[in-house]
Amino acid sequence: MKENFNVSKLKNGLTILTYNMPYVHSVAINLIAKVGARYENEEEEGISHFLEHMAFKGTKTRTAQQIAEEFDSIGGYFNAYTGHENTVYYARVLSENCHKALNILADIIQNSIFADEEIAKEYQIIMQEIAHHHDNPDDLIYETFYNTVYKGQPLGKSILGTTKTLVTFTKEHFLNFIGKHYNAENLYLSIAGNIEHNKIVMIAEELFASLKQGVKSSFIPAKYIGGKGFIHKELEQTSLVLGFECTSYINLGQLYQTYLLSIIFGGGMSSRLFQSIREKLGLAYVVGSYNSAYFDSGVFTIYASTAHNKLELLYREIKNEIIKITETVSTEEIIRAKMQLRSNLQMAQEQNTYKSEEIGKNYSVFGKYILPEEIIEIITNIRADDIINTANKIFSGTTTLAIIGPNDLNGF
């Protein structure tokens, strides 16, 4: 409900967003920094993710152990993650411990010390993360896929960075990056749960007043390139990822048309890919589709794994299904897909972790809170022709194909 949502802006520009859920006992906190891997230049590749790792390694007032102990003492859960477009620090605690959790979070964001020994230690941990990533066929094929989709662009590069850049990072690098991006205009504090907005604003004024106003960060616009990427690796199966350019998340009408297309095409057990490729032909255990959306671009992705000698047949059958969905979509498929989308959206409204993410993302992207009812209306008004037109627009574009396996793949 809109009356449960409130927004305020501090004098320094920090945006405070709350959604009151009086029937729960906890609060979910998200501090969103509008900076991620796509904001990095070549010398900074991996620094957003590295910085997120360093958030728990000590501040001017707390050691790393004290940070861990203080969160454990209030029974809280605290973590962070890095994407291409933002970095998010989040916590979930009982409502009575919200002030304490925000105190720790504010300390981490504003007062981390980046000790040399902790940087060296975390560098080794991230190197292990990269090694694990390269040993995982799924991670490897998607890295190759996005490198091909956005060739030579920050949006196509791994958030983990490379050995070449990571080894160079010092305390000064982290402080400079924070100074450039972690300012009040570039941060959004979103909280959902059993809270009062005015109290949260007062706490935020106390804890975040020293943040400089700064300016919003910018990035280089993405351009879909496409092409082919092959990885030779001795595996039990060969996997492929097939992609096409689709809408960004800015156009909500097109975005939800694409969501519905993805559900019908490869979004579950009743989807066309699952029924054809797995149930009817027995070509794959894993097969499906989804779409990834960014501020200025998007990718519709189809994935599957099969026996080495079935790869060409699998690829051919996927292409056949693509042709079919550009021609017709049944009423039953649309009803089923709409119900899946609506159910997921409405059931998520009951979770304060989801609401905190939702209001934060809405406001950081659109500058407003988009009501669930508005989204449901968009979904309800989508027709079969809309989905068919979306399918034709997407599948007539440049193809990206990534394959990993032991075979000679030059024929593709």
Curated annotation (Swiss-Prot):
Signal peptide: none annotated. Its cofactor is Zn(2+). Keywords: Hydrolase, Metal-binding, Metalloprotease, Protease, Zinc. Pfam families: Peptidase_M16 (PF00675), Peptidase_M16_C (PF05193). Binds 1 zinc ion per subunit. GO terms for molecular function: metal ion binding; metalloendopeptidase activity. InterPro entries: Metalloenz_LuxS/M16, MPP/UQCRC_Complex, Pept_M16_N, Pept_M16_Zn_BS, Peptidase_M16_C. The active site is at E52. Zn(2+) binds at H49, H53, E129. GO terms for biological process: proteolysis. The keyword Protease applies. Its EC number is 3.4.24.-. Belongs to the peptidase M16 family. This is Uncharacterized zinc protease RP219. It comes from Rickettsia prowazekii (strain Madrid E). The lineage of its organism: Bacteria, Pseudomonadati, Pseudomonadota, Alphaproteobacteria, Rickettsiales.
